[in-house]
């Protein structure tokens, strides 16, 4: 190897070059000096109204039904006047409720209150 080639060699070929000519060297240094805290452009104003939040956004339940039943329900939803699942389900419940006898209706309401009470207890345990 000739002497001229040897001079150019080095770690990434930067050996012997002035600092300004070296590859991959940043020209700007990281500024680590202390700077005072920035003031917010719009400070907190407690008089401003709170942005609207979704009411009962997390008050949802899941129904686990067989896939075939789900497909049938989706087909009913498509041909019905309703756009959302809960609307069609509400209509189906209403139709069923009209068929109940007074005794069955009383049992339904008792069962509903029991289920709501258990759900409230479960929710209270989650919040602790």
Swiss-Prot record:
Residues 1-50 are annotated as: Disordered. It comes from the Bacteria. Keywords: Plasmid. This is Uncharacterized protein pXO2-40/BXB0041/GBAA_pXO2_0041. The lineage of its organism: Bacteria, Bacillati, Bacillota, Bacilli, Bacillales. Residues 18-36 have a biased composition (Basic and acidic residues).
